[in-house]
Amino acid sequence: MELFKDIKNLGKLVRLERIFNRESEKTVIVPMDHGVSNGPIKGLIDIRKTVNDVAEGGANAVLLHKGIVRHGHRGYGKDVGLIIHLSGGTAISPNPLKKVIVTTVEEAIRMGADAVSIHVNVGSDEDWEAYRDLGMIAETCEYWGMPLIAMMYPRGKHIQNERDPELVAHAARLGAELGADIVKTSYTGDIDSFRDVVKGCPAPVVVAGGPKTNTDEEFLQMIKDAMEAGAAGVAVGRNIFQHDDVVGITRAVCKIVHENADVEEALKEIRKK
């Protein structure tokens, strides 16, 4: 794929084609790692059903913690890529922004992963530990031919606006600088500023879904704008798995990401009954 022309590692290229659409060269990832940070929230109670629904809706990959893979594995129907999340931290911790490494690239390989991901809160206390982890894991991923997704967010007690374009651009660039193959980060709120984020990051950028939005139109417009700005895809959790029509909203997102549909056209996928 042209998107990954700078990657020469065959193992990475083979795996990346399992989580990206070969024709559009874009991806729709549904993270479901929230159980560690927030517990059994709505949409993640019956993990197998949710995985089934997003797969039927056309998602390219799901992102899970290692212990949930056995409970969410489909074993039938349409295939969906598997991304194992390496980081963990809880909302009830004295330091909820602290993320530690909870598994290895090697274990992810044994579980059949197509990629691994790591979470970095740029600007948080002791964030340097996460930078070290990212750099070392990037080296391991290169050795094994495993694609690495870095979730890079400006977060910390000194960060007043987590969507500040300069901070988001810095966080995204940091992920690429330390070896990530793909960077996931927050949408900055408008096309022009997010385009600058994409331009400043040598690695492909996928946009995070963020908090649950008030309307489908608001959510899908954000996806549309991010794609217009040059995003390589989306990584959306709550706005998909907490939707009343998980299959439909997944189809709507895929319609925009892979077919360049407008919001009104994508909304029709939700209204199908």
From Swiss-Prot:
<dbReference type="InterPro" id="IPR041720">
    <property type="entry name" value="FbaB-like"/>
</dbReference>
<feature type="active site" description="Schiff-base intermediate with substrate">
    <location>
        <position position="184"/>
    </location>
</feature>
<feature type="binding site">
    <location>
        <begin position="237"/>
        <end position="238"/>
    </location>
    <ligand>
        <name>1-deoxy-D-threo-hexo-2,5-diulose 6-phosphate</name>
    </ligand>
</feature>
<keyword id="KW-0057">Aromatic amino acid biosynthesis</keyword>
<dbReference type="InterPro" id="IPR002915">
    <property type="entry name" value="DeoC/FbaB/LacD_aldolase"/>
</dbReference>
<keyword id="KW-0808">Transferase</keyword>
<dbReference type="InterPro" id="IPR010210">
    <property type="entry name" value="ADH_synthase"/>
</dbReference>
<feature type="active site" description="Proton donor">
    <location>
        <position position="153"/>
    </location>
</feature>
<dbReference type="GO" id="GO:0016836">
    <property type="term" value="F:hydro-lyase activity"/>
</dbReference>
<dbReference type="InterPro" id="IPR050456">
    <property type="entry name" value="DeoC/FbaB_aldolase"/>
</dbReference>
<comment type="similarity">
    <text>Belongs to the DeoC/FbaB aldolase family. ADHS subfamily.</text>
</comment>
<dbReference type="InterPro" id="IPR013785">
    <property type="entry name" value="Aldolase_TIM"/>
</dbReference>
<feature type="binding site">
    <location>
        <begin position="33"/>
        <end position="37"/>
    </location>
    <ligand>
        <name>1-deoxy-D-threo-hexo-2,5-diulose 6-phosphate</name>
    </ligand>
</feature>
<protein>
    <recommendedName>
        <fullName>2-amino-3,7-dideoxy-D-threo-hept-6-ulosonate synthase</fullName>
        <ecNumber>2.2.1.10</ecNumber>
    </recommendedName>
</protein>
<dbReference type="GO" id="GO:0009073">
    <property type="term" value="P:aromatic amino acid family biosynthetic process"/>
</dbReference>
<dbReference type="GO" id="GO:0016747">
    <property type="term" value="F:acyltransferase activity, transferring groups other than amino-acyl groups"/>
</dbReference>
<feature type="binding site">
    <location>
        <begin position="153"/>
        <end position="155"/>
    </location>
    <ligand>
        <name>1-deoxy-D-threo-hexo-2,5-diulose 6-phosphate</name>
    </ligand>
</feature>
<keyword id="KW-0704">Schiff base</keyword>
<comment type="function">
    <text>Catalyzes a transaldol reaction between 6-deoxy-5-ketofructose 1-phosphate (DKFP) and L-aspartate semialdehyde (ASA) with an elimination of hydroxypyruvaldehyde phosphate to yield 2-amino-3,7-dideoxy-D-threo-hept-6-ulosonate (ADH). Plays a key role in an alternative pathway of the biosynthesis of 3-dehydroquinate (DHQ), which is involved in the canonical pathway for the biosynthesis of aromatic amino acids. Can also catalyze the cleavage of fructose-1,6-bisphosphate (FBP) to glyceraldehyde-3-phosphate (GAP) and dihydroxyacetone phosphate (DHAP).</text>
</comment>
<dbReference type="GO" id="GO:0008652">
    <property type="term" value="P:amino acid biosynthetic process"/>
</dbReference>
<dbReference type="GO" id="GO:0016744">
    <property type="term" value="F:transketolase or transaldolase activity"/>
</dbReference>
<keyword id="KW-0028">Amino-acid biosynthesis</keyword>
<dbReference type="Pfam" id="PF01791">
    <property type="entry name" value="DeoC"/>
</dbReference>
<feature type="active site" description="Proton acceptor">
    <location>
        <position position="33"/>
    </location>
</feature>
<comment type="subunit">
    <text>Homodecamer.</text>
</comment>
<dbReference type="GO" id="GO:0004332">
    <property type="term" value="F:fructose-bisphosphate aldolase activity"/>
</dbReference>
<feature type="binding site">
    <location>
        <begin position="209"/>
        <end position="210"/>
    </location>
    <ligand>
        <name>1-deoxy-D-threo-hexo-2,5-diulose 6-phosphate</name>
    </ligand>
</feature>
